[in-house]
């Protein structure tokens, strides 16, 4: 092995190690483990749309913007520097985190989409000052605060509205993608007008079946393409009233489809599935097929 080849090998190992360390050491204060939650009895409907509260998830949203074919600009909305990336219109994903907040799986998904040419904005709902715990990830228990869905829908709407005001966002190609509680929000998001709509949606880790009416089904008033992906034996959804898949509720758009993972002995029992290469390809192929 010559010195040049050896040097390249060292560089590759260093970059790989850095990438692994970045995810393993990733920290966010907008996570269940760090958040000081509000008691449900102290949560009031007026707080949901309080301008200060609504602005916090947007200001603290994580941002990923692709630069060329290999680099990603990583920042937040409040710290973004337009001089750090090329001036162009980016097809953009609004990414909605799960009930535990922002974690390494959030940034892994954001980076994956950015590597495939999409800008990604992930509003941090737990940046709100008043926010009640909605799940316990240690016990796979959800539904601890029913009204969280309304808050998440408000945050999604606000992110879409503000994203369309950004000069670098292609407002004809904005997509909504979410995992778990973020997937529930993605499925049930019901924009009041087409300006607040999106060009497509990806629902990960949700069955669209629930005991609460507002959690059940899919809202798609503008018949946009929807991809849903769920593991048949997802440990979060083994109660009878949660079993099923979003394909039972999808619209008639020709690009809409439901993927149920039932044959893979490992993946079929997982909650998040977008780490799997086959599922990644399905997601990217879907997005690329509906770009306007």
Outline where the language-model segments fall:
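Serine-hydrolase catalytic machinery in alpha/beta-hydrolase-like enzymes
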Residues: 56-169
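Loop/turn elements at helix/coil->beta-strand transitions in domains of secreted/extracellular proteins
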Residues: 89-92, 116-119, 170-173, 196-200, ...
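An N-terminal hydrophobic leader/cap segment in hydrolases
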Residues: 18-82
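The feature captures the conserved acid-bearing segment of alpha/beta-hydrolase catalytic domains
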Residues: 200-265
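Primarily recognizes the serine-hydrolase "nucleophile elbow" in alpha/beta-hydrolase
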Residues: 159-221
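C-terminal catalytic histidine-bearing segment of alpha/beta-hydrolase fold enzymes
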Residues: 254-292
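Hydrophobic h-region of N-terminal signal peptides that target proteins for export
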Residues: 10-17
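Sec-dependent signal peptide recognition
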Residues: 2-8
